[in-house]
Amino acid sequence: YIRQSLTHNSENNQLRNQLYDITKTPDEIEEIDIKDKYKVIKERRNSKLKSDYGVVTLIDQYVVNILPEGGRKSKVVLVYEIIDENGIEQMKEYQLNTYSLTLQKSEIVKADGSIVPAEEGSGTLVFSNLAIGDVIYIEYESYSNSTGRFYKDFNLDCYFNSTYPTVEAVFAIINPENVNYSTKLFNG
């Protein structure tokens, strides 16, 4: 009955979590997510990439799980390295509308491995005392659920043209077997 209820009320995340707990359904995003991001940061920092903006993207990951009952869950991981003074200016304030998101990480990983949390306020993450060699780590999840005639339809776009040079960009879709896609590629 819970699954049937979700079919008619897909925005009820509490009910979905209850169903997944009862049926022991794993979080599919967590199954493919990078497990130890701090290890990856340590391995990738000091990349040889150059940037006029003073920032290199070490990880740009966007994973979306199309839920069988309708709607979707998304997870974003962004990891930036500051490589010169321009990067400090670029990244000291990061605009992110956290209203509809669950912010999981927003921190600076210093060169010595210490972690400094960002300050949050009105759609802005503030990274104080940035220095060259610091890495900014941002991670958040969001749900996009609705009801009505088009509740199973969605438009999703992802870009691979970041302002900053990127070491790794990941765009992944997890979907039920019966999902059909209509795709368009522009300027590709």
Tell me what each language-model feature is:
Residues 3-188:
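Beta-strand-rich, non-transmembrane domain signature
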